């Protein structure tokens, strides 16, 4: 079985792929101090609790946190006797090479998302990912990543507001009933929610103008469903887009062997 690992700035997600479907998906807070042994104990406990008899023999990793990759490699080598494929490393090939400025480093999660997006929905595509950052990644008709946009993430914006303004509380993002808030919490929630609706609409509109194409739009990330409530911002929300991309990239590299 394949162990797919997506390490983001906030959370690290582990999924077990049996060749046809994901048997389980778990997440843990990203911590560069967490050892391979700790990962193994955590994974083994979850596998036991869910009664999944997973004989992991392969692994693929995408990580936006370089310091975590070493211990994830050790986890795969020591406990699953496999050498993981790491997206972004020279040994990892992509179906279509990115078409960006020479020397540009593209986050592996963004590349993984575009591979999955193209596979599922074809080219001329915008992938919006609501993560620690809110990213917009553009795929051309051939399936190549050609660039995108990076904006502060929703929760990051809320945290920054709370940290910079002593009188403003930390609040959870939710869809407000109206734009005009009648208390401080409602005002913050309204500003963030409607602000990000406008952000998505504006950036998508500008990308379409620059590409002179209608461009399909898909969204992923934990907060994507919250912004998909009656606004027709997205053609589709894909909950496990990154994991699907990791599986596709792993299979593509196996086929090249």
UniProtKB/Swiss-Prot annotation:
SUPFAM superfamilies documented for this protein: Actin-like ATPase domain
Cofactor: NH4(+); K(+)
Alphabetical list of CDD domains matching this protein: ASKHA_NBD_PanK-III
Catalytic activity: (R)-pantothenate + ATP = (R)-4'-phosphopantothenate + ADP + H(+)
Signal peptide limits: none
Pathway connected to this protein: Cofactor biosynthesis; coenzyme A biosynthesis; CoA from (R)-pantothenate: step 1/5
Residues holding ATP: 6-13, 132
One Gene Ontology term, aspect cellular component: cytoplasm
Entry GO MF terms: ATP binding; metal ion binding; pantothenate kinase activity
Residues the record lists as binding K(+): 129
Binding site for substrate: 107-110, 184
Pfam families: Pan_kinase
Cofactor binding notes: A monovalent cation. Ammonium or potassium.
Subunit text: Homodimer.
Function: Catalyzes the phosphorylation of pantothenate (Pan), the first step in CoA biosynthesis.
Protein name (database record): Type III pantothenate kinase
Organism of provenance: Cereibacter sphaeroides (strain ATCC 17023 / DSM 158 / JCM 6121 / CCUG 31486 / LMG 2827 / NBRC 12203 / NCIMB 8253 / ATH 2.4.1.)
Taxonomic placement: Bacteria, Pseudomonadati, Pseudomonadota, Alphaproteobacteria, Rhodobacterales
Annotated gene: coaX
């Amino acid at each position: 079985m394949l162990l797919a690992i997506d390490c983001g700035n906030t959370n690290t997600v582990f999924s077990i792929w049996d060749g046809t479907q994901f048997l389980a998906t778990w997440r843990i807070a990203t911590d560069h101090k967490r050892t391979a042994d700790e990962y193994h104990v955590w994974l083994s406990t979850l596998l036991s609790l869910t009664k999944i008899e997973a004989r992991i023999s392969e692994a693929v990793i995408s990580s936006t946190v370089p310091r975590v990759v070493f211990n994830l490699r050790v986890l795969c080598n020591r406990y699953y006797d496999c050498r993981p494929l790491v997206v972004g490393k020279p040994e990892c090939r992509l179906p279509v090479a990115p078409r960006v400025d020479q020397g540009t480093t593209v986050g592996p999660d963004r590349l993984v998302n575009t591979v999955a997006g193209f596979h599922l929905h074809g080219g001329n595509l915008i992938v919006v990912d609501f993560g620690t950052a809110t990213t917009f990644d553009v795929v051309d008709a051939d399936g190549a990543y050609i660039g995108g946009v990076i904006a502060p993430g929703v929760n990051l914006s809320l945290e920054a507001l709370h940290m910079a303004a002593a009188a403003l509380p930390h609040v959870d993002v939710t869809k407000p009933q109206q734009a005009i808030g009648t208390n401080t919490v409602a005002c913050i929630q309204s500003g963030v929610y409607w602000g990000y609706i406008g952000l998505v609409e504006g950036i998508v509109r500008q990308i379409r103008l620059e590409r002179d194409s209608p461009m399909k739009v898909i969204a992923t990330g934990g907060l994507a469903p919250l912004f998909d409530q009656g606004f027709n911002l997205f053609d589709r929300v894909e909950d496990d887009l990154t994991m699907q991309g990791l599986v596709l990239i792993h299979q593509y590299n196996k086929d090249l062997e």
